[in-house]
Amino acid sequence: MSTSVPSALRIEGLGLQIGGATILKDVELDVAAGSLVGVIGPNGAGKTTLFNVVSGLMKPTSGRVLMNGDDITSASVPARARAGLGRTFQTSSLFPRLSVLENVRLAAQVSLGGDYSLLRFPRRSDAATRLALTKLEAVGLTHKLETAAGDISHGDKRKLEIAVLLVTKASIVLLDEPMAGVGSGDVAGLVENIRDMQRESGCTVLMVEHHIDVLMGLVEKVAVMYFGTIIAYDTPQNIMNDPLVQSAYLGTAAA
């Protein structure tokens, strides 16, 4: 008797229009819990916009977004975060003047029941500090605890963002171009950090990435976006051999 893995994230008929322009059109996606899924497509295909809608930064014109079976289409950004949705952006979302440790400790304090007010943030909370140090050790940043987040490399910033996600215990994680700006020598380590995050927490990961070779070696399935819709969703091997996908990247696929 076979058993199917429940959906962590389900997108049904999602559409977005802005000023009469169609940005997303009939997007359908079913992401199994605990899976690691890549999202690829040409520039302007709608990948980041899709993440913006899923994370609540933009409201769709039509369709639904379900998280673990619950309709979150109208939920606020904080409500989605409380439900377990985490995200990184193409540009850093860290507090640049706070140290590496303070960035993660702040997130840890919130995870332990505090809030994001820096005025009320207990800088020496033992529980938050222990949690932060554990996650910083996991991503290999304990040697930069007192360095300002704005002063570390792009690769280390990505690692720091993963440490923040780990302390928030996000069950669904959206990674928007995590390799952007990362030096070639740091890519392999960051890939391992993403794998470790997924294994350790059991979270579901969706990842937009232009480094196709890196992505294909990391994910279990790939969704291909083209002109605001998903034209293919399959294993990396099948995606690479799909004529429709190949023509989309050559610019000849039907919209």
Where are these regions (language model features)?
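Glycine-rich phosphate-binding loops of nucleotide-dependent enzymes
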Residues: 2-255
